[in-house]
Regions:
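FIC/Doc superfamily catalytic core
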Residues: 1-335
Length: 335
């Protein structure tokens, strides 16, 4: 019978899919100045690597991950943590080079897992389906003897039927089902998230590879794991998981739009947004406008620290000050 995902297109899910599609079109339409694409791709790759490895407990900060990408060895970091990060960079590059593959095979999955999990496996062998039974918290995945057959079914669905759905949905379904089967002895989480990105890439949803959706999962890991668990609790009904993932894509694309504006602004400034910048921009997006004192209280920074954050954002045309000098407020600039 094969794998047949079960879900309901609720009004909430439909609305989120439509919102994500509109945001994507806006971003794609702005991607006309190709000179800045490589810098944004590099920043996105670094963010995805940091987020996906951090979900699994890797302690390296975003700046330390960025240092490794640039060939520098971050201070106070252990060998395994560095290896996990280096592996994930290599895994994403493997995926990026294979976006045109029409049919995914078991060997493609084995090679991706071999790259991601090489030298960092706690049990089992990288690049081979597990031969042992495993337990993940309270969840007991299928027994080892069933893994190969279940993965044949998943690959058959991915290759033959995923294209019938929006990539927003098919990537989320692939992500969940891979984690549910848990085909490898270790390293399934990061492999599943890489596969979800692969689906967005090969379906042409993220043609420039500038969407760092893994940050959404990392920023609230308990909610991420809870959303996965709710599918099992509901008898494999994926509806709540799809609503969660589409909300994540919506937030991700809103952040990407801010980054695109930072690179594609009217000024010559090209700004790489740091987490603090994005926190400030999110505050302005949510509140509409904020006084200086409101900003530094919300950010828990000094007045000078807040001004230091604001200057590059204003220089890049992302933020502007309106009103009088004494009573002025900060707002997001209109696109």
């Amino acid at each position: 019978m094969g794998y047949q995902p079960q879900f309901t297109i609720t009004p909430k899910l439909l609305s989120r899919v439509e919102t994500v599609a509109a945001l994507r079109e806006r971003i794609q339409g702005a991607a006309v100045e190709l000179s800045w694409i490589p810098a944004l791709q590099k920043d996105t790759r670094t963010r995805n690597v940091h987020a996906s490895t951090a979900i699994e407990g890797n302690p390296l900060t975003l700046e330390q991950v960025r240092a490794l990408e640039e060939g520098r060895e971050p201070a106070a970091s252990d060998k395994r943590s560095r290896r996990e990060v280096v592996n994930y960079f290599a895994g994403l590059r493997y995926v990026e080079k294979r976006v045109s593959i029409e049919t995914l095979r078991h060997d493609d999955l084995f090679e991706l897992h071999r790259i991601l999990a090489g030298e960092v496996m706690d049990q089992g062998e990288a690049g081979r389906y597990r031969t042992i039974n495993v337990r993940v918290g309270n969840y007991v995945p299928p027994i080892a003897d069933d893994v190969s057959g279940l993965m044949f079914e998943l690959l058959d669905w991915w290759n033959r039927h995923a294209g019938e759905l929006s990539p927003v949905l098919s990537s989320a379904i692939l992500h969940y089902r891979f984690e549910a089967v848990h085909p490898f002895a270790d390293g399934n989480g990061r492999t599943g998230r890489a596969l979800a990105l692969w689906e967005l890439y090969r379906r042409g949803f993220d043609t420039h590879h500038i969407f760092s959706v893994d940050e959404y999962y990392w920023e609230d890991r308990p909610r991420y794991y809870s959303a996965l668990a709710k599918v099992r609790e509901s008898g494999e009904d994926l509806t709540v998981w799809l609503e969660y993932c589409t909300e994540g894509l919506r937030q991700t694309l809103e952040n990407v739009w801010l980054r695109v504006q930072a690179y594609n602004g009217q000024s010559a400034t090209r700004l790489v947004l740091r987490p603090r910048h994005e926190q400030l921009l999110a505050l302005l997006r949510d509140h509409g406008s904020m006084a200086p004192a409101e900003l530094w209280q919300a950010l828990k920074l000094s007045k000078q620290g807040t001004l230091n954050l604001l200057r590059p954002l204003m220089a890049a045309g992302l933020v502007e000050k309106v009103g009088s000098k004494k009573m002025g407020r900060y707002i997001l600039s209109s696109p």
